């Protein structure tokens, strides 16, 4: 968990400094989160630069006015305080400007992925909300593209 918090802190610091990339120590969970960020278009990508030390370079992404799509990255559930959500309540969460990472028996998934999986199940599954990524307010065209990407 601390590695992931360090990664989030490095990303935030890099975005504030308008850096093109940041280097962090990776783990399986870090790679999983970074691949989701890359798929969602929140970062340009990432690359392992030293396998023996597990160092990863994260390439940050900016809009034309040099502002980031990422507004905040919050670690919600920690060891002592966990936040769970029932499957029936997943439909009520608005994914328009926030990206939720939920840990369920299917592993770590974004909220739209879990909603799609729940459509196939008799009883919808919930899970533990691990991370919330707040996306900056963007122009409506980009926001529509993000919504369409989640629907596909």
Swiss-Prot record:
InterPro entries per the UniProt record, alphabetical: Ribosomal_uS8, Ribosomal_uS8_sf
GO molecular function ontology, one term from the record: structural constituent of ribosome
Presence of the UniProt keyword Ribosomal protein in the record: yes
Primary localization class, coarse: mitochondrion
Location relative to the cell: Mitochondrion
Keywords: Mitochondrion, Ribonucleoprotein, Ribosomal protein
GO biological process: translation
Keyword Mitochondrion recorded: yes
Domain of life: Eukaryota
Secretion signal, residue range per the UniProt entry: none
One Gene Ontology cellular component annotation held by this UniProt entry: mitochondrion
Homology family: Belongs to the universal ribosomal protein uS8 family.
Protein name (record): Small ribosomal subunit protein uS8m
Species: Dictyostelium discoideum (Social amoeba)
